[in-house]
């Protein structure tokens, strides 16, 4: 099984935002940017507007677990950044999974065009 790697540097996040492809729904925004052989990396951005620290950390843990669980579905050598919107604050694991795959489908559709 492949290792889960997180984006850490601000410059990595900025590159994904500036040059990546994005798709969104009411709950999530997903950015995807091909990197040069650095492997599959994930970043999570959750604003303080979403809720208190407990809520933000719960959403981050849910998304991190979803990415880890479905690691093989994500493209190799790409950076992915999930931005959680304010409406996500009351969502549970299965709802977030549904929203994640909805955004993933929109992103793949957009890349094909």
Swiss-Prot record:
Catalysis performed (reactions): Endonucleolytic cleavage of RNA, removing 5'-extranucleotides from tRNA precursor
Keyword Cytoplasm annotated: no
Gene name of the record: rnpA
Organism expressing this protein natively: Desulforamulus reducens (strain ATCC BAA-1160 / DSM 100696 / MI-1)
Protein name: Ribonuclease P protein component
Domain of life, per lineage: Bacteria
GO cellular component, one term: ribonuclease P complex
Stored InterPro entries: Ribosomal_Su5_D2-typ_SF, Ribsml_uS5_D2-typ_fold_subgr, RNase_P, RNase_P_CS
GO molecular function ontology, one term from the record: 3'-tRNA processing endoribonuclease activity
Subunit and interaction comment: Consists of a catalytic RNA component (M1 or rnpB) and a protein subunit.
This protein's UniProt keywords: Endonuclease, Hydrolase, Nuclease, RNA-binding, tRNA processing
Pfam family, one: Ribonuclease_P
Record-listed E.C. numbers: 3.1.26.5
Main function: RNaseP catalyzes the removal of the 5'-leader sequence from pre-tRNA to produce the mature 5'-terminus. It can also cleave other RNA substrates such as 4.5S RNA. The protein component plays an auxiliary but essential role in vivo by binding to the 5'-leader sequence and broadening the substrate specificity of the ribozyme.
Record-stated family: Belongs to the RnpA family.
Coiled coil: none
Class in the EC hierarchy, top level: hydrolase
Biological-process GO terms, alphabetical: tRNA 5'-leader removal
UniProt KW Transmembrane keyword: no
